[in-house]
Amino acid sequence: MREGEDDTQFTIVTAWFDVREFENHHLKDVDENGHYCIPDHYFRSAALLFNKEMPMVIFTEERYRDRILSLRPPSYIDKTVIVIKDYCDLYGWDLFPRFLENHQNAPIRNLSVEKFTAIYKWIINQKVEFVREAIELNPFSTSKFGWMDMRLHVVYDMSVEETIEIFNGIPEDRVLITQCSYTHPNEIGDRRGFYEWTRGKVAAGVFLGSRDALLKFCDLCREELLVSISEGLCPTDEMIYSVVIARNNGLIEPHIGDYSDVLRNMSHNRGSTHLAINFLNKSFQEGNHYFTWKVAENLRKGVLNESICPSIEQVYNIWYYNYVANFWLGNREYCKTILYELYRIGSQKMELGDHIRGMKGFLLSMIDYLHDSDITSKFRDL
């Protein structure tokens, strides 16, 4: 951004609670292991986020206030609000004994017991509560908000400019959150069976959106947590989000990637391409036109930017599925853009051209629905 210019119409929300110290974890003084890092390492990693000139609301314990403020450049202090919380101040704390009992009686079978302790799971389930409180406080009078894990920029250091671009692209009525695989409501079935295993459905390092959409998402997540506790369960944040997403597709702006690609894939696909392709195929099969369009579009940009190199069949499907989804969504002019683009690439790349020719009869029958003689003629002569 130019000096004196501020285009950030959003507030970033994050948090730090030293649960290892709180629970007197037997590994709390270990320098680092495969399950978590100690506070010194954590804060060094968080410096990349804290050095960004973005309005932030940060939830933490009293003893970490000064340390966090010291990581923010002095010129950004007026864009920083620290909210101090004791554990007893956390939402639903009176339910934690029941949650702990559930944790012991109904363990998640494929999670590390060293990392995913009861209090750790409780804290990560507070993300939506922190976002809710930040929205209600709204100290910077912004219209959009976003949760970001403190260390996420270590994986991909997304700039302020790119962050602004991402926020500007999120529809007012949707929440952008990263999914790793498609979840159909039928998969959930018995909540107890679904929550018995973590299924790697969501990478919850970031979720972003406008005030009302986020509040609705937070409400749904709170409701799902409370029902789960009442049924003797103790899911993680990502498990709860996967259920909320499956049952509320119309609230979700789809974004695909593993945790390492949560930020990297925001503007276009750069990694976890296999996850995105699988998600695209499933969205298309399920007739989820909006998800199909958005996932295909992210992959399309990745191909055009030469950030990814899918197979010829996958490239064809990215454009074809994008066309079909937009046809059903009523975006007919964009359908033409997609088809002209597919024709141009097929004319330039022999293997893709051969693939299109092998599908020509079927493709022409689909293109005919547009009633555009120029496009039909081009593909007929390819």
Can you annotate each of these PLM segments?
Residues 77-137:
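Active-site-proximal specificity loops/subdomain of glycosyltransferases
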Residues 154-158, 175, 195-279:
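Catalytic core and acceptor-binding pocket of nucleotide-sugar-dependent glycosyltransferases
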Residues 119, 123-177:
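GT-A fold catalytic core of metal-dependent nucleotide-sugar glycosyltransferases
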Residues 302-312, 347-354:
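Flexible helix-coil transition and linker loops at the boundaries of alpha-helical arrays
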Residues 1-41:
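N-proximal low-complexity "stem/linker" segments adjacent to membrane-targeting elements
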Residues 335-350:
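TPR/TPR-like (Sel1-like) alpha-helical repeat modules
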Residues 278-281, 317, 321, 359-363:
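"A position-specific structural signal for the A-helix of alpha-solenoid helical repeats
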